[in-house]
From Swiss-Prot:
GO terms under cellular component: cytosolic small ribosomal subunit
GO terms, molecular function: structural constituent of ribosome
Similarity field: Belongs to the universal ribosomal protein uS2 family.
Taxonomic superkingdom: Bacteria
SUPFAM superfamilies assigned to the protein according to its UniProt record, in alphabetical order: Ribosomal protein S2
Record organism: Chlorobium chlorochromatii (strain CaD3)
GO biological process: translation
UniProt entry tagged with the keyword Ribonucleoprotein: yes
Name under which the protein is recorded: Small ribosomal subunit protein uS2
Coiled coil: none
InterPro entries found in the cross-reference section: Ribosomal_uS2 (IPR001865), Ribosomal_uS2_bac/mit/plastid (IPR005706), Ribosomal_uS2_CS (IPR018130), Ribosomal_uS2_flav_dom_sf (IPR023591)
Keywords: Ribonucleoprotein, Ribosomal protein
Length: 251
């Protein structure tokens, strides 16, 4: 599991919050001071809470369940897509489509439609339709891919959400809370920490801050999955060894 160090967070600007006049009073326990009208986040608390969150994410990843990455703001979308893909997790980086969680079966129908268009391109169907129809299907597929591509392989609801900017992703937070799906999130000083289960007080606007946090989450998931595979291999080897011992005894 990755571990956050205060020095790394300082270099990434994780401690810079929003203007003090835009703060959410519920973030007071996580604020170190106000400087030049800007709130400074207490990185000791960030490190403690972030490491607690990573430990919980590690436990989820070891069960084989999926953790959905969510971040559609300009500074986060590329990072979210890259790190979620690297850790083989579903993600939403373009736009949260209402019902992505609460109306998941309907969303799955749209994904099946996208896959159907892909099959048309390879099974000869495209050769039997007009150029205009092919163009329309291509545009439909492109639109679906842009919005749903990150969850195209997700066959069931995720076990948890990891979110960058809970104010912007309020729809995702609301749907997760409705379904009882735990939410892990970077929470800036202008946001309500009570909306999420695992608060990581952090600058959710700076690219380096987002990169540091999202990469650590992805690293934790990857390491947890690798450990799970290693444990399964060792368990299989132990079983084979026991069976071999039984055969030796019977002989």
């Amino acid at each position: 599991m990755s571990h956050f160090q205060v020095e790394d967070m300082l270099r990434a600007g994780v401690h810079f919050g929003h203007l003090a006049r835009r703060w959410c009073p519920k973030m007071k326990p996580y604020i170190f001071m106000e400087k030049n009208g800007v709130h400074i986040i207490d990185l000791q608390k960030t490190a403690e809470l972030a490491n607690t969150a990573l430990k919980a994410l590690e436990a989820i990843a070891q069960t084989g369940r999926e953790i959905m990455f969510v971040g559609t703001k300009k500074q986060a979308k590329v990072i979210i897509a890259e790190q979620a893909t690297r850790s083989n997790m579903p993600y939403v980086s373009e736009r949260w489509l209402g019902g992505m969680l609460t109306n998941f079966q309907t969303i799955r129908q749209s994904i099946r439609r996208m896959n159907s268009i892909d099959r048309m391109a390879t099974d000869g169907t495209y050769d039997m339709i007009t150029k205009k129809e092919r163009l329309m299907l291509g545009r439909e597929r492109e639109k679906l891919m842009r919005i749903l591509g990150g969850i195209a392989t997700m066959n069931r609801l995720p076990a948890a959400l990891f979110v960058v900017d809970i104010k912007k992703e309020h729809l995702a937070i609301k749907e997760a809370r409705t379904l009882g799906i735990p939410v892990f999130a970077m929470v800036d000083t202008n946001c309500d920490p009570e909306l999420v289960d695992y608060v990581i007080p952090a600058n959710d606007d700076a690219i380096r801050s987002i990169q540091l946090m999202v990469k650590a989450v992805a690293d934790t998931i990857i390491n947890a999955r690798e450990l799970k595979v290693e444990q399964e291999v060792l368990a299989t080897m132990d079983e084979a060894e026991v069976e071999g011992d039984k055969e030796d005894i019977s002989e």
